[in-house]
Amino acid sequence: MQPRDLSAHEPYVPGRGTKEVARELEVDPDSLIKLSSNENPHGPSPAAVDAIADTAETVNTYPKSSHTDLTARIADYWGLSPEQIWLSPGADGAIDYLSRAFLTPGDTMLISDPGFSYYPMSARYHHGSIRTYPVSKEQDFQQRASDILTQYDDERLLYVTTPHNPSGSELPIPEITALAEGVDDQTLIVIDEAYGEYSNNPSAIKLIQEYDNIAVLRTFSKAYGLAGLRIGYAAVPESWADAYARINTPFAANKTACQAALAAIEDQSHVEHSIETARWAREHYREELDARTWPSGGNFVLCEVGDGNAVAEAAKQEGVIIRDTTSFGLPECVRISCGTREQTKRAVDIISAVIEDVETATTTTESGVETEVGRP
């Protein structure tokens, strides 16, 4: 007995956790700064923590009312009807829901390269195929509707990540509008706004009242600090919102996650503090790191360092965990998440020193001189 052929499916590889790295280095986890997974360094709202505790004694019952209450609150926040909110276990779950609703065998999904690895995974799970459009370093990762439309070939689903991961670049509302008007009426444009709270641009959610070929993804994992609870949603046009009842997983958004998210929405001061910190940190990285960086609308910065793996490994040895972006096709770069002000300042000092050390070691090795880090 064997499953179907899964050879085309690449497994999702998450960033390593602090405890895992601490065991490897044989150090106290509290001595490490994790800046590799774009998490909220301030954690969840205290109100969300209280809601989690309050829910503990009732997890023996299904989350029907919690699900309904959160859906209604999100809808009210955006000025939509509750039917237009597809609650899901993280934004990943919403990606799968849209694949279930729109993909039939042989359909194609158009996604950015580089981009989030779960888009192609979801397409293949649902017997679809993938085509890509470039978001290239040579063009400073700029996203333009005209460039996307050049690669467009009547795909059923078209994903745009704004702010883009790992570059942080954005596609403004006028460009999204141009995209919506430039594709076939049977193509759904999915705007992934996982990092939308950190952006200075308005959300594309306002467009779904005008265009029935746009859906928008949002998550509570980032600015709301609830990554461990896996709660997100898609905002969809009213004309086909009723499809949710036919494709969603029953009670997929658990009660604890729903109650925590409901409390987190009400504590906007915590969200605003988290956003303010991230915006300060990303500018601090760009101003203080002695390496090329790009403007970012997210809670992270992409940094060109020459040898991303070597820099990430050396930074880890010094207690700062960052993301080597080789898996994104950018082996010369690292992605650095925004920490607290204290964490960010410490990270800048360590990463700057590490970049210099790696560059020196590489230059020395290439010149044929024996060093501690390598031989000719």
Swiss-Prot record:
Pathway: Amino-acid biosynthesis; L-histidine biosynthesis; L-histidine from 5-phospho-alpha-D-ribose 1-diphosphate: step 7/9. The keyword Amino-acid biosynthesis applies. Its EC number is 2.6.1.9. It is an enzyme of class 2 (transferase). The modification N6-(pyridoxal phosphate)lysine is found at K222. Coiled coil: none annotated. Residues 1-21 are annotated as: Disordered. This is Histidinol-phosphate aminotransferase. It comes from Haloquadratum walsbyi (strain DSM 16790 / HBSQ001). The lineage of its organism: Archaea, Methanobacteriati, Methanobacteriota, Stenosarchaea group, Halobacteria.
